Regions:
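Low-complexity, glycine/proline-biased repetitive segments and flexible coils/loops
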Residues: 1-330
């Protein structure tokens, strides 16, 4: 009789060529007075154009059996009586995308710098603050504001693909456009900036790619989850919209599989001979991903034969089961 034993075959020694898209959480929209849109989360990728006009970054070369950090940044908060907050950073191994800057709020208040900069708040008198900067190769600056007692218009939040629009007389600035990516096999635009509020007239629209719209009468629209879109500005003391959460997308060859720690929310898909993992939430900043692979094997499994009968008219024992195949997944 043979006892069954567990066994393990380690992955190959060669490095794993890995594409990535890492987007941080978007900044919250302003919500006191003269409110501006939040900036989009920072946008870094090896599979196409990065944010802020940056080129594609180098692919990562990773190893089997090593735990790599993965974190999805939350969107920035917003309220009706305070300036919003910046979005949180997203991380994959050595790649960190910076959270989007909060939109300005109250008289002449500047937006925050971030992955993309928040828009500048307006005022009845004075001059507009300088535009809040985005992070190089991640996102663009927010827009400036138009000053006027009953004609003000705040600045839109910057997007990964374009600056936030400046406010104009009774017109809130639009959020900057996001950037399209085909890393999952289809084109999706993410990381648009949040639209701004205005005294009357026309609020700023959210930038393409999940930016929230501003308002001239009510609350701002939140940035879309898992796009890193900036939050739209609220009117007067109405709350601005929260920033959209970020996302981390990992693309590896079809023979490589990812194993995530328990606090990771992830979906998987395949496209063009690759396995694609879209991480949409992490419960802590200590979550990890480890890579394994399929090991090609040829196998033959034969069971023991049955014993023959031991009395009159007895029959012979049956042969054991027989199975063979290849490409066993480990």
């Amino acid at each position: 009789m043979f006892a069954a034993k567990n066994f393990f075959l380690a992955g190959g020694a060669a490095g794993i060529t890995t594409d990535f898209l890492v987007i941080a959480g978007g900044g919250g929209g302003g919500g006191i007075a003269y409110n501006a849109g939040g900036g989009a989360g920072g946008y870094r990728t090896s599979a196409g154009t990065s944010g802020g006009g940056g080129s594609a970054e180098a692919q990562l070369t990773l190893s089997y059996g090593i735990a790599y950090t993965v974190t999805v940044g939350a969107g920035g908060t917003a309220s009706g009586n305070a300036k919003g907050t910046n979005g949180s950073d997203s991380v994959f191994n050595t790649i960190t995308s910076v959270g989007g800057g909060a939109g300005g709020a109250n008289s002449n208040n500047a937006g925050n710098s971030g992955g993309s900069g928040g828009g500048a708040a307006a005022a009845g008198t004075g001059s507009s603050p300088a535009a809040a900067a985005g992070t190089a190769n991640q996102g663009y600056a927010g827009g400036t504001s138009f000053i006027g007692a009953s004609t003000w218009g705040a600045g839109g939040g910057g997007g990964a693909g374009a600056v936030g629009a400046n406010g104009a007389s009774t017109v809130g600035g639009n959020g900057g456009a996001g950037v399209a990516s085909t890393i999952t096999g289809s084109s999706v635009t993410r990381a648009g900036g949040g639209g701004a509020a205005a005294a009357s007239g026309t609020p700023g629209s959210g930038g393409s790619g999940g930016g929230g719209a501003g308002s001239i009468s009510s609350t701002g629209t939140a940035g879309t989850a898992n796009t890193g879109g900036g939050g739209g500005a609220g009117f007067s003391t109405n709350s601005g919209g929260a920033g959209g959460s970020g996302i981390v997308i990992i693309k590896v060859p079809s023979t490589v599989y990812a194993v995530f720690s328990s606090g990771v929310t992830v979906t998987s898909s395949t496209s063009g001979g690759s396995n694609i993992y879209s991480v949409t939430a992490t419960s802590t900043t200590s979550e990890t991903v480890t890579f394994t692979n399929i090991v090609p094997l040829e196998y033959l499994v034969v069971a023991g034969g049955g014993g023959g009968g031991g009395s009159f008219y007895a029959g012979g024992g049956a042969a054991g089961g027989f199975r063979t195949g290849s490409l066993l997944s480990i």
